[in-house]
A protein has these predicted regions:
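N-terminal amphipathic/basic leader segments beginning at the initiator methionine
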Residues: 1-41
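Beta-strand segments within the central parallel beta-sheet cores of soluble alpha/beta enzyme folds
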Residues: 5, 46, 85-93, 126-129
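Generic secondary-structure signature for well-ordered alpha-helical cores
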Residues: 10, 51, 77-81, 91, ...
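Surface-exposed, flexible loop/turn segments at secondary-structure boundaries
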Residues: 13, 94-97
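Conserved catalytic cysteine-centered active-site region
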Residues: 39-65, 96-129
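Short glycine-rich, polar/acidic loop-and-turn segments at beta strand-coil junctions
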Residues: 61, 72, 90-95
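Aromatic/hydrophobic pocket-lining residues that form the small-molecule binding cavity
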Residues: 68
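Phosphate/pyrophosphate-binding loops at sites that engage ATP/ADP/AMP, CoA/4′-phosphopantetheine
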Residues: 71-87
Length: 129
């Protein structure tokens, strides 16, 4: 069996939250008391330790399977292939879809199976793991 990756895709959420957005936040110790350093100092230390200046958040209406399907669609376009020629969909994840505001995961069917459906792949030989 020959295996090769011929395309890749990704999804980068549009909602940006920069370190500056945290200036309005109060940072607390484990016991709930405020940290003694200023917010500016805390944010500066966080950046110097992690290198993170901004993070991205997905829209609250998007599920994990939606995000994965967008990335998969981009990979199909990048590879210039017919989606029906895909042999396997492998989605490495240990949790299912979780709707915004909920704590219960929806794990069945698997995320890979949901992605196959969202990609409208009809080929029964395309196995979703």
């Amino acid at each position: 069996m020959n295996i090769k990756i011929i395309g890749s895709g990704s999804y980068i959420p549009e909602i940006k939250v920069t370190n500056q957005d945290f200036h309005k936040h109060m940072f607390l110790n484990e016991d709930g008391t405020p940290l003694t350093h200023s917010t500016e100092v805390i944010i500066g230390k966080f950046k110097s330790i992690t290198g993170i200046e901004e993070r991205r958040y997905a829209d609250e209406n998007l599920l994990t399977s939606d995000i994965a399907a967008i990335a998969a669609e981009n990979a199909i376009i990048d590879a210039k292939i017919d989606r029906e020629s895909i042999d396997y969909i492998i989605l490495a994840h240990n949790f299912g879809d979780v709707k915004h505001g909920k704590i219960q995961a929806d794990t069945v069917p698997s995320l890979a199976t949901r992605v196959k459906n969202k990609l409208r792949i009809k080929n029964p030989k395309c196995v979703a793991y």
